Amino acid sequence: MDIKAQLKQIQNKGLYRELQPIQSVEKQYIYINDQSYINFTSNDYLGIGQVEYQPQNFLDFIKTYSIHLSSSRLVSGNSVVYQQLEQAIREHFNFEDALIFNSGYDANLAVFNIFKNNNVVIFSDQQNHASIIDGIKLSGLSKVIYQHLNYDDLESHLARHTNPDVQKVIVSDSVFATNGTKADINRLVHLKQRYNAILIIDASHSLGLNLFEYHADIDIVTSSLSKAWGAHGGIIFSSKDIKDLIINKGRSLIYSSSLPSYHLYFIQVSLQHVIEDTYRREKLNALSEYFNHQFMELFPDQPLSNTPIKNIVCDSLASAQAQYDMLFEHGIFVSYLRYPTVSQPTLRISLSYFHDTDDIDRLFNVMKQYDEGDSYV
């Protein structure tokens, strides 16, 4: 195995990635090498990750519940705060039960473990998150990939699987992280019911944003708690029986130490803001509409997103890199996505509560300076 040759190959394809050292964030600004940039990369959509905490409340919490129980939840790491949080969160979202994980990635790995060694086939959207793909793969499950958001294609696959002994499982992101498109939850529920399937929805980029009404007919909802929640961790909503099965078969839960207690404190505080701070969602929705108005003028042929995730699809790595560099030079930090994350090079722009219309104006003013040519698809 030639490691240097592999790295050289990645570099030659223009796909080489590096970790960017970040100093700090403050509202809509991010600090890199002592320079400030408007931050259009954060998943902290509601700005809850930067709320001010009461130091004494935090210290009282740690004094009561310790810093870290230093064990897995199935041994001695199952803090009573887990139960309190799981009950409060599942009641707010009207689910029978909930289970907190160390990350949304871990939650998806655990979910698919419950189907291992069973006669099932998974029907997965073409653009589902990598954690879903890995969960299916690591559990050794049969799968069918349907075209992105093409529910006629999904139904044609479901209709061809007629063996009553095979359990069908449909899985989809609610909001897709790379392009901001939204799943049709009502259509997925209809197909689940028609074909007697289990339905799993990953709500990592929608939980807390009120983009969907959660249906009682969704069997399992998974989510990160590090996006709109501004905390750290993951969660699964399900029936009590499914939760118990995950506890007994979910390897990423069984073999991981529990979250430090202070993380549970931040989840607790975030829940309060998710429930009470409706003004955060209202401002974010207004910013999204303002962004889309300018986006339509500059990119009339590119699809709109009514979520906080916006993207610009480029026709080459070179044009994407040039646009990314130009924005960075003008003090604007966006996400640059490339293969294998996306099939075409893409600049992703994430809006947050902290942005204002001046930030969006500045972004588009810089993009208008760029010689479009054949730069965009």
Pin down the residues of each PLM region.
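Structural motif of enzymes handling amino- and sulfur-group chemistry
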Residues: 258-277, 283, 287-292
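N-terminal "arm"/small-domain region of PLP-dependent enzymes with the aminotransferase-like
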Residues: 2-5, 9-67, 197, 214
